[in-house]
């Protein structure tokens, strides 16, 4: 009886893993449809941003499933949901990322600080420049709790549950109105996911 239950559980785990892999593969395929557009817009701009990073950010933001694929409305207008077409979203997103990358270079901080600043805002780059010059989860969490959240009304440190393969090892929560302090790590993970799936698709 126990062996049968164990087999069922193992089968269930394999089926779930297979389903998740299929969903991730579909999401990667969706994001990769924007590759020509990303490449074209990058060629128009003087930017240190690269194609792989931008695609990973699209995957992180929307998986390519919304009009504002890079969720760049707020950086353009100060309000959300004001950009509805993909090209404008990507163009604005790349402009914002470019500004962050140049500022990060000027301040002598790492590239992942610039990526995290896409979620937190460019002031995060100054914060990291004054605190070791390298983006860490501890510093991102501190900035979320002490700067972003209070600025947007959460002065009590209130949190909410946030389940993600990265967050489950670090408390599985975020601060209300505090942005996403896992953002740069999610982008990095998604960068590898896209590379792996595209490599697999090419070799297949």
From Swiss-Prot:
Underlying gene: pvaA
GO biological process, alphabetically ordered: carbohydrate catabolic process
Entry GO terms, CC: cell surface
Protein name, as recorded: Pneumococcal vaccine antigen A
Pfam families registered for this protein in UniProt: Lysozyme_like
Compartments, record wording: Cell surface
Domain of life, per lineage: Bacteria
Family matches, as InterPro entries: CwlT-like_lysozyme (IPR047194), Lysozyme-like_dom_sf (IPR023346)
Location, primary (coarse class): other
